[in-house]
UniProtKB/Swiss-Prot annotation:
Residues 21-295 form the GH16 domain. It is an enzyme of class 3 (hydrolase). GO terms for biological process: carbohydrate metabolic process. The keyword Ion transport does not apply. Optimum pH is around 7.0. It comes from Microbulbifer thermotolerans. The active site is at E147 (nucleophile), E152 (proton donor). Belongs to the glycosyl hydrolase 16 family. Its main location: periplasm. Gene3D superfamilies: 2.60.120.200, Galactose-binding domain-like (2.60.120.260). This is Beta-agarase AgaA.
Length: 433
């Protein structure tokens, strides 16, 4: 059932500090904002495992599925095929080949099982294929109306393709699907060249986007800020999003494509190119995702799975077989309207504390939490959709708490709001101000 946090993914979330990831020591180039720091998101993947083309592996399927966000098999001559992606030697490989007896092209595509939402920094270390095909790392909403392209590039060394080989397409789209309308920026800055003649197929490069908010994107190449798009005039000048900008949760997609605008002009791979393993593969060393969270140098943290009593106020919810919070490792799930749990926290000093709650939920509305601390009047916070049951975000209560002396304090955390199904919980933090 989707409301159950997988034990393996919980370990990934809770244990990221216990092993060295490939990106350790590589700073996030974007600024998380005043009083904030970067927190690694569990969708991050260093691909340091094996997943064969046919059958993949449990580790792969924790985060990814083969194919697209829906049954569509790709643009133009593309046909995404599950056996044209694999993980080996510490890298994800997206490959290509001819579909027998046709002019179509088999290509690999993988899509994240859970979406992401702003604010988030998303980056890949990748090496383009040496093909006229697009090598892609991009993000798309479930209804295919909002898109962010981190990597969209064409690495071929074929004569006549030099201009594209030296550029990365750094862009986004907003769509109306019926009748179909598509906007993306067309300014010169959307095609990035570093001025050094770099061919992006020749080596691995880091390309990232900080999706700061619905109206602001920052693009980074090898740690350098190379493009910023900000404001309605460039994000959505035609109002296709109805004034909300790039606001919808989006799924991560890594794939290759034979795109119409190229194949319609005769720019499509030959059989020889498709059969050449030295050019037909797009490699991704790692992908990483970070959320900006408050700095917690003076924080006391309580894991939400470490309650000493739990229960429920109100009627049972259909499908919820657990009374109160369900302990799942250090986290909680099966949380429905009216569920509560009691905790104890040891605060190190007298004074005022900010309270941060780390939760995840795909529910579109009606989410909330209530904190009753040391028997005082309850404090409430309205929560919102984070993009999935495993996409955790930090929410800060609008009111602080104060204690007159250090020591142990009891508190109760309760789910509130109109939605029957509420949120999965990670931790609550008390930050000394």
């Amino acid at each position: 059932m989707r409301k159950i946090t997988s034990i393996l993914l919980t370990c990934v979330m809770g244990c990221t500090a216990t092993y060295a990831a490939d990106w350790d020591g590589v700073p996030v180039p974007a600024n998380p904002g005043s009083g904030k720091t970067w927190e690694l998101h569990p969708l991050s993947d260093d691909f340091n495992y094996e997943a064969p083309a046919a059958g993949k592996s449990t580790r792969f399927y924790e985060r990814w599925k083969e194919g697209f966000i829906n049954p569509w098999t790709g643009p133009g001559l593309t046909e995404w095929h599950p056996h044209y992606s694999y993980v080996s030697g510490g890298k994800l490989a997206i490959t290509s080949g001819r579909k027998p007896g046709t002019n179509q092209v088999y290509l690999g595509s993988i899509t994240s099982k859970a979406p992401l939402t702003y604010p988030v920094y998303m980056e890949a270390r990748a090496k383009l294929s040496n093909m006229v095909l697009a090598s892609d790392f991009w993000f798309l909403s479930a209804d295919s109306t909002e898109e962010i392209d981190v990597i969209e590039a064409y690495g071929s060394d074929r004569p006549g393709q030099e201009w594209y080989a030296e550029r990365l397409h750094l862009s986004h789209h907003v769509f109306i699907r019926d009748p179909f309308q598509d906007y993306q920026p067309t300014d010169a800055g959307s095609w990035y060249a570093d001025g050094k003649g770099t061919k992006w197929r020749d080596a691995f490069h880091r390309v990232g986007v900080y999706w700061r908010d619905p109206w602001h994107l920052e693009y980074y190449v090898d740690g350098k800020l190379v493009r910023t798009v900000s404001g309605q005039d460039i994000i959505d000048p035609n109002g296709f999003t109805g004034g909300t900008g790039l606001s919808k949760p989006m799924y991560a997609i890594i794939n290759m494509e034979d795109q119409n605008w190229r194949s319609d002009n005769g720019i499509t791979p030959t059989d020889a190119e498709l059969a050449d393993p030295n050019r037909n593969t797009y490699y991704v060393d790692w992908v990483r995702f970070y959320k900006p969270v408050p700095i917690n140098g003076n924080a006391t943290t309580v894991e939400l799975g470490n309650f000493h009593n739990t229960g429920k106020d109100g009627a049972n919810v259909t499908g919820d077989t657990v009374l109160g919070f369900n302990k799942n490792g250090n986290n909680i799930n099966y949380n429905t309207k009216g569920d509560w749990a009691d905790y104890t926290v040891n605060l190190p000093a007298a004074g005022e504390y900010r309270v941060d709650l780390v939760i995840a939920s795909p529910m579109s509305s009606g989410l909330g939490a209530e904190l009753t601390f040391a028997g005082n009047a309850a404090k409430t916070v309205t929560l919102s959709n984070t993009g999935g049951w495993e996409s955790y975000q930090t929410f800060t209560l609008p009111q602080t708490i104060s204690v007159s002396s250090p020591g142990n304090y009891n508190f109760r955390l309760k789910s509130t709001g109109s939605s029957n199904w509420q949120w999965n919980g990670d931790e609550i933090r008390f930050v000394k101000l």
